[in-house]
Amino acid sequence: MKTPYLVSILLAAALAIIYLFQDQYADQMYLFSNAFPPVIAAVTVVSSIYGLMKYWGKLEDKFSKIWLGFTLGMIFWFLGELFWAIYTLLLNVEIPFPSIADVAWLIGYAPMMIAFHWYVRTFQFTISKKVYRAGAITIGLVSFGLFAYFLTPVLAEMAGKEVVAVGIDIAYPALDLALFGYALLALLIFTGGKIAVAWALISIATFMDVVGDMLFSLTTLQGTYYNGHPLELLFHFSYILYALAFYAHRKEF
C-alpha cells in the first residue's frame, strides 16, 4: 500500500479513537476540535497546490483553470477553518455561527463548483449522450430527494431562529449536494479509467460533507451542537479524502 493511503487510514483511525474517548480529556478536546481542522485543511491546500503546479500551463487553458478552482476553493475552506479557530480559541466565542468563517466557506464553493463543472463538461464526450443524460437525471433526482428529506426537520426547527442563520444552514447542504452530483457524474465518466480512483475519493468526500453539513445544520438549529461533536469526523475525513484524491490524480494522469 502506498504511503499516503496508509497514513490516511492510520490518521482516520486515530481521529475516530480521539473522538470516541473524548470524555477522558474534555478540556483538551475543545482545543483539538478547533485547532485540528485548519491543520488538515492546510494539508489539503498543499495537495491541491501540487496538482496545480503539475497541470498549470497558462491561464487560458481549461485544465489550468480547473486546478486553479480546486486550489482557490480549498484555500477559502482553509480560511473558514482558521477563522473559526480564531473565534473559538482567541476570541472565546464558543460557537461562531454565523460568522466571517461562513463567508469564507461559502465563497470557497464558487471556484469548486466551477472547477467541477468544467471538468465534467470537458470529458463528458467520452460517454454517450444517452448515458450521460440518464446519469444526470438520476443523480439530480437523488440529490433533490436528499435535500427534501433534510429540509423537513430544518423547517420544523426554524421558528424563532435568525433568517441569516437558517439561510446558511440550508445553503451548505444544497451546495454540497451540487458538488456531490458533479462528482458522481465525473465518476460515471471515468469509471474504468486512470483517474476513477481520484473521483471515487472525491465523491465520498463530497457525500461526507453533505451528511456532515446536514447534521451540523440540524444540531445548530436545535442547540445541541458542541465543539468535539462526533459529526466533525465527517469533515476531517472529507479533507483527508480530498487530499488523497488530488494525490491520486497527480499520480495517475
Predicted ranges, named:
Residues 1-253:
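Polytopic alpha-helical membrane-helix bundles and their juxtamembrane interface segments
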